[in-house]
Amino acid sequence: MNVIFIRHAESEYNRDGIWAGRADCSLTDKGIKAAQKLGETIDKDFDVIYCSPLKRTKQTLFAIFPEAKTIYDDRIIEISVGEWENTKKELYSNELRELFRKGLYTPPGGETHSDVDKRVCDFIEDVFEKFH
């Protein structure tokens, strides 16, 4: 079995330096073009495609695979950044952002890196059980 993971293309929040987390922002034109370019080069012979239900991931998916039959799964949704969601990254110190990146700090109301690891690992195990 071959498994390919594709991250969503550039979103408006990526471009603007805003914490997205679970916010349902759209791709930029640059992001859509990048995903379409990937779609021109990637093999499209897949048995199954899974996708996060967020708008930016769906837009990336359909730019690459316009007619994809897809299973949406909340377990592969982006990490919740709690109170940081929809705020400018520059509002937080570099040190605090680095601690978050390393999984040593969780924003108030946010999801721990351990929680993300568990739900994503559960997803991967389920997929491998189903197709192995």
Task: Identify what each model region corresponds to.
Residues 1-4:
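Extreme N-terminal starter segment of soluble prokaryotic enzymes
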Residues 64-121:
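Phosphate-handling substructures
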Residues 23, 126-127:
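A short hydrophobic/aromatic micro-motif that marks alpha-helical segments and, especially, helix-coil
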Residues 42-45, 127-132:
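Glycine-rich phosphate-binding loop signature in dinucleotide/nucleotide-binding domains
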Residues 6-68, 95, 109-115:
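Active-site-proximal alpha-helix that buttresses catalytic centers in soluble enzyme cores
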Residues 35, 120-124:
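Short amphipathic alpha-helical/adjacent loop interface patches that line ligand
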